[in-house]
Amino acid sequence: MQIDARHGSADKTSHQVMPLPFGKLVLCLLVAGTIAALIAVLLYPPLNPLALFSMLDWNLIAAAEPLVRQCGSLPLLDKFPSLGWNTVLFCATLPSTDEPLRTDSFVAHTRDTILANLGSVEPNWRWKVSSETPEACSLAYHRQRVLSAWLASAEHSVCLQALARRDTRLISFYFVLSGHIEITDRRTRKTLSISPNHVASARERAGNRMTIQSESSWLAFHIPESALRRSFEDLTGRPYVHEFVLPATCFSQDDVQGLYQTLRQAERDLNSAASKAMPLLAKAYKQLALVKLFSTMPHNLAEAFCQGTSGAAPRQLLKAEAFMRENLTNPVTIEDLAAAARCTPRALQRMFRTYRGGSPMSVLCNYRLAAAHGAIKAGRAGSITELALNLQFSNPGRFSVLYKSAYGLSPSSALRFTRNEGSVEQA
């Protein structure tokens, strides 16, 4: 009987399942996702690993950060739903492996091939061709990568309709040569209309609708907002405090035609450049295009770029911003800002939303992120945690998420690049 009891106890013990620690569970999920992505890359040769990670919008926090601290700050949990959806979206938009390999340039003459190829080169848009399209139709498309940005040009006889699947944090500039483009923003319910010889900027937000008229010809310049932000701050030495907007503008005029000519020349030169010269040439053209964009186009940041002001802002708002710049390393509340501006908190919030497109605290956050970026680039940052705490970010993990959202890479990566550049210069 004693033997049976011991065996029974052993059986019960063997059937008990030990719970998996939370940190190990998070690590297992991340490892499983990485393995799945690598398998997809190996099994599908045209798949670009960098494009996959960009599509997943991963935030890779420094490996030196303890996993417990990452889990405690919970930035990863907030990302899991979007990671899952983005993975499904990316896989769903892949063409079949039975189909011939597609390049970034194509010419299609049937409705089905037009949709298939557009879905391959522009996967964030759900494309449709007008039902009135005749059997004899055509679409010629070419895309040219310019580092983190890219150029896309097209000429087509069909009417195209598209629905954006998700937010991409891209700013797109559409130059319409012939035809017409309309983009409707789902959030603001406003429609941007771009007629021939005009250019305007638009954001790829989930639910946005785009209609491109038949017999249209256009050039698009797509760039991450983080790259636009870095360029603006590097050129002006001031923080990028609100979203960039370029209204519909005629680009055939002499003073604003330079950007279009630069992009066309970049398209030609990069298409014929040798592989060794491509990175340096792309970097030069990207910098030149952004300088011309900021200095010659009538965007909403033009006055701030040229004169160091952000328009005729109220005196109270300017006082609040001056107080922000003087107290980047000190705790600041909305009441402190209102007292410095000598107005009520509600009035101050209303002024910031009108003239800065955001709340006072979001503008203060942008100032602090810009200060962190400047400290990292100048080599003044000892550690990311110390830098975050010094600038009043109580959660280093959250600081990493905000920094990457603003500048396109994690602060630890930016710090590592700065140190590597410094060591190369010393050598």
UniProtKB/Swiss-Prot annotation:
InterPro entries: AraC_XylS_family_regulators, Homeodomain-like_sf, HTH_AraC, HTH_AraC-typ_CS. It comes from the Bacteria. SMART domains: HTH_ARAC. It comes from Sinorhizobium fredii (strain NBRC 101917 / NGR234). PROSITE patterns: HTH_ARAC_FAMILY_1, HTH_ARAC_FAMILY_2. Signal peptide: none annotated. This is Uncharacterized HTH-type transcriptional regulator y4fK. It is a single-pass membrane protein.
